[in-house]
A protein has these predicted regions:
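Residues that define the transmembrane beta-barrel architecture of outer-membrane proteins
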Residues: 26, 64-68, 112-118, 132, ...
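Residues on the lipid-exposed face of transmembrane beta-strands in outer-membrane beta-barrel proteins
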Residues: 32-34, 70-74, 84, 120-124, ...
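Short glycine/proline- and aromatic-enriched beta-strand/turn motifs that initiate or cap beta-hairpins
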Residues: 21-73
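Repeated loop/turn-to-beta-strand initiation elements of outer-membrane beta-barrel proteins
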Residues: 79-82, 129-132, 161-169, 209
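Outer-membrane beta-barrel "beta-signal"
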Residues: 29-31, 193-213
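Extracellular calcium-associated, cysteine-rich motifs in secreted modular proteins
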Residues: 205-254
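Gram-negative (and chloroplast) outer-membrane scaffold detector with strong preference
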Residues: 73-152
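Outer-membrane beta-barrel translocator domains and adjoining extracellular loop/strand segments
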Residues: 42-50, 94-103, 148-153, 181-188
Length: 254
């Protein structure tokens, strides 16, 4: 675990030094932080019971006290991006089905079972460009809980709160429908459907600005010479409103 935390810290430092806003200019983003696994959704049969304790962190959420997920995404176009997520956890709180369908849902520790997942996703930021940046996502993956393993179909919601154009806080909830939905949900061999929540920092990067004038190379008419935005990145040394490349006397206003 110590080595994993060091790896995440190194990634954080590297990305933090080179990050920009994710869009067609800066298409890459990396997120990392903590995740929580909640098994109540498959223990309950009624929708109201499945979501009634959505925020019951103390009783239902399994959380590792360390960085426990990493996500990398690539912007495609029109708010769409695709990515991959890897996560680890420990299952210490397992919500059991009700005996005979009545009574309370009990929570037991099945034995500190290990949890691993690897998932792919397609994400749509439906109102991009704002400080509050919500999105929906769908995808699929594979989950391991102790001796059990199976594929899942995933879907959920998320939102990123941008502190700056390159750093934000991302919150996400994902429902994972298990292909191994055994009636008894018995661990350690079964992998029941569950919710997985994520909270972490997001850094965006990937843009190229060779001359450092704040205009990305793909939009810069003079990508190797620092210039002005109003001239598409070309310089006007003498400030006479004529770019140097078209100015017969570029150092004398005329």
């Amino acid at each position: 675990m110590k080595h994993l935390n060091k790896l995440f810290a190194a990634v954080c430092i590297f990305v933090g030094l080179s990050s920009q806003a994710q869009d067609s200019n800066n298409p890459w983003a990396i997120s990392f932080g903590a995740n929580a696994v909640d098994t109540r959704v498959s223990a309950a049969t009624k929708v109201e019971d499945q979501i009634s304790q959505y925020f019951n962190v103390e009783d239902n959420w399994n959380i590792l006290p360390s960085i426990s997920y990493i996500n990398v995404t690539r912007h495609i176009s029109n708010g769409f991006s695709f990515g991959v997520t890897g996560s680890i956890n420990k299952i210490k709180k397992f919500v059991n089905t009700r005996e005979g369908g009545v009574g309370e849902y009990t929570v037991t520790n099945p034995g500190d079972f290990s949890y691993y997942s690897a998932d792919g996703l397609i994400k749509w930021n439906f109102i991009p460009g704002y400080i509050v940046d919500p999105y929906v996502h769908v995808g699929g993956g594979y989950t391991w809980i102790e001796d059990g393993n199976t594929g899942t179909v995933n879907g959920g919601l998320g939102v990123t709160f941008w502190f700056s154009e390159m750093v934000g806080l991302t919150l996400q909830s994902t429902y994972k429908q298990s292909f191994d939905e055994r009636a008894d949900r018995a661990l350690p061999n079964a992998v029941p459907s569950h919710l997985q929540h994520f909270a972490g920092l997001t850094f965006k990067f990937g843009g190229k600005d060779t001359d450092g004038d704040g205009i990305y190379d793909k939009d810069d008419a003079c990508p190797e010479v620092a210039g002005l935005k109003q001239f598409n990145g070309c310089p006007d040394t003498d400030g006479d409103g004529i770019i140097d490349g078209s100015d017969a006397c570029p150092e004398v206003a005329g």
